[in-house]
Amino acid sequence: MVIINTSGGGSRSALWTMTVLQSIDETTKGKALQHTQLITGASGGMIGASYYRALVLEEQLGQISNRFEKHYRENISKDMLNKLAFMATTNDIFIRYQSTKVNGYTYTKDRGFAFEQQLNKNTNNILNHSLS
């Protein structure tokens, strides 16, 4: 039984987690992930772990051919903070009056929404789906 615990730390932690998971998984020829029962952690580490897990699923479904490719690490390390920094400096003045609908529910667009949009763009929408 394998339990993976990731640490927080923003985009560096996301990249580190992604790199470590790729290395362990490639070295063990996928056996480590087959025996993984729990992936837990915080912040950037969980983003990296979620992205890697999504890549594994995409490979199993035949959507991608090789989850170990370098460009996946490059994707997760792309800038996600410029848009957020702009929103923080403008104090969400213009953004808070915008909303979006998801599955019949209306949500206010905020920094979290902007972060999610940038993450989806950076990772080619691989994480852009409902969990239910």
Give the residues covered by each predicted segment.
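Catalytic domains of lipid- and phosphate-ester/thioester hydrolases
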Residues: 1-132
